[in-house]
């Protein structure tokens, strides 16, 4: 039996926010398949979610990597929750070689899309997401496609390097 899920993409090449709350996460109460590539870090609280039909509990400093094709569903928050994230449209993700940037970390990402980070490493990614948020949400600044692609490649390469140091 084939299961069809609503397809979800981003309205722009890159979108980053530093204060994603339950109000926004409720959009994903119904299971959907991402066309975009989204990377997030939990900054506050905890929540239950389903990623590729497996249940996860997400806590502060957890890194969540959602590659194109991932099926996601926000189940519930167990306390006030907040995330920061950077998302890249299917069009942007399609222009780069995801496998080249992820490399041998691909099986780890599929097996474990939620990875706890130490405070220091999490802070680096939060700062990078904050920079992308300021740029992507600024009406007076348009991020060039090449800059957007490099940003996605930087994040994916960082994740590959982080995962190479973590034994999952």
What residue spans do the PLM features occupy?
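Hydrophobic recognition helices of helix-based DNA-binding modules
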Residues: 136, 159-163
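Amphipathic, well-ordered alpha-helical segments in soluble domains
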Residues: 38-41, 124-131, 151, 155-158
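Generic protein-terminus/edge-of-domain signal
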Residues: 1-59
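Conserved small/polar residues in nucleotide/adenosyl-binding loops
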Residues: 166-168
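A hydrophobic/aromatic-rich effector-binding and dimerization subdomain
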Residues: 2-11, 75-138
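All-alpha amphipathic helical-bundle segments outside canonical DNA-binding/catalytic cores
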Residues: 120, 137-151
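Histidine-centered metal-chelating micro-motifs
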Residues: 64, 68-74, 93
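Short beta-strand His + acidic residue motifs that chelate non-heme Fe in jelly-roll/DSBH
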Residues: 49-50, 72-77
């Amino acid at each position: 039996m084939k299961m069809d899920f609503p397809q979800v993409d981003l309205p722009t090449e890159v979108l980053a926010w530093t204060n994603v709350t339950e109000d926004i996460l409720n959009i994903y109460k119904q299971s959907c398949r991402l066309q975009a590539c989204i990377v997030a870090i939990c900054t506050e609280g905890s929540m239950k979610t389903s990623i590729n039909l497996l249940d996860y509990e997400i806590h502060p400093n957890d890194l969540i990597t959602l590659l194109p094709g991932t099926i996601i569903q926000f189940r519930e928050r167990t306390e006030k929750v907040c995330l920061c994230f950077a998302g890249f449209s299917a069009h942007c993700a399609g222009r780069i070689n995801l496998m080249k940037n992820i490399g041998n970390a691909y099986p780890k990402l599929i097996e474990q899309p939620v990875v706890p980070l130490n405070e220091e490493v999490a802070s680096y990614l939060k700062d990078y997401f904050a920079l992308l948020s300021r740029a992507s949400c600024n009406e007076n600044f348009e991020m060039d496609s090449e800059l957007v692609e490099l940003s996605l490649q930087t994040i994916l390469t960082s994740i590959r390097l982080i995962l190479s140091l973590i034994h999952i």
